[in-house]
């Protein structure tokens, strides 16, 4: 797994070791959908409900969701408002362990089609820190760079963190 420490620095870390390191702290883990738990290239562009589930990642996240100190969130952007309902349906079907109140799905249409990376970085700036370790898992380096730029305290992990 790869962890981004500082601008340009990369460190290999294993997710289980990482979580063990914070077993006595609250962890808020935000997980992207497209390309992380759902195959981004499979199906039609606007029919998210037809995306193929990536079961190895889903199974690992389901195990993580059972840890008492981890709050697991979906953290996804969608181009159009209708994508919100499609993603909710998909989560209900393939990853129902993501609590409905922990599903952050941001519609670009409702935000003047601002780039997903900017929307995600803005959202992360407003996440209540409350002493928790904040983690974002995403497959898009552009999103990770945008989040890092304005959220230096957030731990960024590539989607490969879910594959041992």
Where are these regions (language model features)?
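Non-catalytic pre-domain segments flanking phosphatase-related domains
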Residues: 1-31
């Amino acid at each position: 797994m790869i962890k981004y420490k500082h601008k340009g620095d990369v460190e290999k870390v294993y997710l289980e070791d990482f979580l063990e390191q914070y077993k006595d702290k609250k962890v808020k883990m935000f997980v992207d959908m497209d390309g992380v738990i759902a195959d981004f290239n499979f199906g039609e562009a606007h029919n998210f409900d037809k995306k193929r589930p990536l079961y190895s990642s889903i199974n690992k996240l389901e195990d993580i969701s059972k840890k008492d100190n981890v709050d697991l969130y979906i953290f996804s952007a969608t181009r159009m408002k209708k994508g919100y309902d499609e993603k909710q349906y998909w989560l209900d079907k393939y990853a129902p362990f993501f609590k409905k109140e922990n599903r952050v799905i941001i519609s670009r249409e409702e935000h003047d089609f601002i780039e997903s990376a900017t929307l995600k970085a803005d959202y992360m700036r407003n996440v209540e820190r409350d002493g928790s370790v904040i983690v974002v898992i995403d497959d898009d380096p552009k999103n990770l760079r945008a989040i890092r730029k304005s959220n230096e305290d957030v731990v960024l992990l590539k989607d490969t963190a879910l594959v041992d």
